């Protein structure tokens, strides 16, 4: 049995991995995001993820991005491992960071996202979209297959907010053991009220849904997709419910979605507090790839925490594993490399 389902057989000639790095002040709401030891430290998570993915360690951030209470290491360890094993080209894209990493980033000149309980959550949505589209057009002649991931703490809450504004009622996943759905719903209700919105009222205005309830990662990914669209490039959105929300936005914008797929981890799919697969069916996602790193067989306790639901996805981990599968890398090879990355970081023990 393959560790990527459905099994991928056709290796692309010119793949590329992109990771959009963003912040939303929605993550500052206590107990909402577990993508960092404290709500304040979530500001550093995307920068730390980028430094880790690029160099194998953190450089400028004060602490390795981890999830309490067991200090489970960030999913960026999986992305780092896949990029190292495949040697695939990659780029990081700054779309509204509070803290910028000490590694090269393409800057879309986006502002960090505001708390969605404010009337405006994302400023200059159209401008960010256009700049990302221009970037996609610049890159499209270099690739035939692109995997786009994200790192944004609080992103599952903004995803749920956007989905509700578009008319989709569903629970989203979480980076925590216990999904704080009650808190998320309360925050979203307050956000809808602050913007004068009701369920499904923005189904014909997806850009406004981002401006009111979203985060700056969303217009960046949508713009990239638009930039790649007019060519034969296959696009994989790497993520769980956040990329399902991005797909919904793309669909409501009227884009062609035939060459789009989503790749995520087994941990998102098996999250009983969410309904990821049902949501992708409702949205009509053409293909969903599910990666299983097999961390239950690992000697590291921190990796075992993934098996129990602590952290499920992030930093494009599912898509990066999908990419590793395309290169013919086995689950055992991949897990061994993740353990090596953790040992160098002294994480996950």
Curated annotation (Swiss-Prot):
InterPro entries (alphabetical): Nict_dMeBzImd_PRibTrfase, Nict_dMeBzImd_PRibTrfase_arc, Nict_dMeBzImd_PRibTrfase_sf
Molecular function in Gene Ontology: nicotinate-nucleotide-dimethylbenzimidazole phosphoribosyltransferase activity
Gene3D superfamilies the record matches: 3.40.50.10210
Family: Belongs to the UPF0284 family.
Xref: HAMAP family: UPF0284
Protein name, UniProt field: UPF0284 protein Mbar_A0178
Natural source organism: Methanosarcina barkeri (strain Fusaro / DSM 804)
